[in-house]
Amino acid sequence: MAGHDSGNAKRGRSPSFGVFVRKPVERAPAKGASDGAVDSQAIRIDAAQSWPDDAVEVGAVVDAYGLKGWVKLAAHAGAGRGGDALLKARDWWLQKGAERKFARVTQAKLHGDTVVAHPDGSVDRDTALALRGARVFVRRGDFPALAADEFYWVDLIGLDVVNEAGVALGKIADMIDNGVHSIMRVEYPATGKDGRPKTGERLIPFVGVYVKAVEQAAGRVVVDWEADY
């Protein structure tokens, strides 16, 4: 399986997306922008919308866009790899500092290598600027569906990794994009040269030659990989 954010062990082609590759977010405020928490006037809050258990951070507001309350976002993955979640989801949860808010998004679209969107109730540039720096979360359940043999990185992290002989190799701690394919960063308990316990690490390419099965229901990934590699 290859790609920024999801994998496809069977086909070896670049898949859709998964956990999100973060892009740097400019934190310095623009002139006239607010440094405070999310302005309650910038979005309409539904008190019944509590923070979802399956919230996944997918981007951040980096600036206002235009004069009519639109915001510009840096997605943690590009279109077709994770930015799609920003485009599809209409319910967003925003976090700026310690304050969390819910926003219903009326429109979202691609704009160059960014996403621009209009949160309901953001009526002008000032209210949009007040959202600058807010982290954007959506429900995992609102992600676009993938093919049966494609996987979101966020669903792979935490799975056990075993080889075909049943030897435990550790747990997926992270997924890495090397520009060609995805790599599983697998952590396991080990012992250092000084005899003290430490965390060992294995880097296993997420491609079909090594990944033999992804068994999400069983919570594991089966690989063709030896413990002494």
Curated annotation (Swiss-Prot):
The PRC barrel domain binds ribosomal protein uS19. Belongs to the RimM family. GO terms for molecular function: ribosome binding. InterPro entries: PRC_barrel-like_sf (IPR011033), PRC_RimM (IPR056792), RimM (IPR011961), RimM_N (IPR002676), RimM_N_sf (IPR036976), Transl_B-barrel_sf (IPR009000). GO terms for biological process: ribosomal small subunit biogenesis; rRNA processing. SUPFAM superfamilies: PRC-barrel domain (SSF50346), Translation proteins (SSF50447). Residues 1-21 are annotated as: Disordered. It comes from Burkholderia mallei (strain ATCC 23344). Its main location: cytoplasm. The keyword Cytoplasm applies. Binds ribosomal protein uS19. Keywords: Chaperone, Cytoplasm, Ribosome biogenesis, rRNA processing. One of its GO terms (cellular component) is cytoplasm. Residues 148-229 form the PRC barrel domain. This is Ribosome maturation factor RimM. Gene3D superfamilies: PRC-barrel domain, RimM. It comes from the Bacteria. It is found in: Cytoplasm. An accessory protein needed during the final step in the assembly of 30S ribosomal subunit, possibly for assembly of the head region. Essential for efficient processing of 16S rRNA. May be needed both before and after RbfA during the maturation of 16S rRNA. It has affinity for free ribosomal 30S subunits but not for 70S ribosomes.
